[in-house]
Amino acid sequence: MKLDVFAGQEKSELSMIEVARAILEERGRDNEMYFSDLVNEIQNYLGKSDAGIRHALPFFYTDLNTDGSFIPLGENKWGLRSWYAIDEIDEEIITLEEDEDGAQKRKKKRVNAFMDGDEDAIDYRDDDPEDEDFTEESAEVEYDEDDPDDEKSEVESYDSELNEIIPEDDFEEVDINEEDEEDEEDEEPVL
């Protein structure tokens, strides 16, 4: 196989993605290729060994998917995105979705042999209309300012967060004299 695009270039310097693009461009729009056929063409053109292709195959497949110039056409066929207008791609997707919607399976209705003619029997499969209206109310956390347990839990959580940042071993012990603080608050400023 000869690709005119790469005339004068060394095949060892070409990437598999460049060769794939050139092969698809040369074949034209109506000749999409299966992935395996595309890889075989690339291998033949580049002259790579089976082991070399096996090693490069995951990278090539990733490049093929992430490169914006290629498009998967289903059934592992690949083509160039430039072959298809954006509207045409959307139309293909829409027609596929319409085909899937038309073939919905009909659900079979089960019949309970024990409920024939008995109006008082309870059918536990029926949903209770009261259940449909039920919505679980979100429990709001209320803070009671007078409850010392709330303060303790807040202090404990704050301390645990501080311990994650700075271990307790690094703290210095400081004595706090509460009487001194109260005396300072009671004093009036001197003018």
Swiss-Prot record:
A UniProt-annotated Pfam family: HARE-HTH
GO terms of molecular function: DNA-directed RNA polymerase activity
GO terms of biological process kind: DNA-templated transcription; regulation of DNA-templated transcription
Gene Ontology cellular-component annotations: DNA-directed RNA polymerase complex
Region (Disordered): 118-191
Gene3D superfamilies: RNA polymerase, subunit delta, N-terminal domain
Domain HTH HARE-type stretches: 14-83
Disulfide bond entries: none
Listed InterPro entries: Asxl_HARE-HTH, RNAP_delta_N_dom_sf, RpoE
Alphabetical UniProt keywords: DNA-directed RNA polymerase, Nucleotidyltransferase, Transcription, Transferase
Signal sequence region: none
Superkingdom as given in the UniProt entry: Bacteria
Subunit structure: RNAP is composed of a core of 2 alpha, a beta and a beta' subunits. The core is associated with a delta subunit and one of several sigma factors.
Its biological purpose: Participates in both the initiation and recycling phases of transcription. In the presence of the delta subunit, RNAP displays an increased specificity of transcription, a decreased affinity for nucleic acids, and an increased efficiency of RNA synthesis because of enhanced recycling.
Family to which this protein belongs: Belongs to the RpoE family.
This protein's name: Probable DNA-directed RNA polymerase subunit delta
Organism the protein comes from: Streptococcus pyogenes serotype M18 (strain MGAS8232)
Originating gene: rpoE
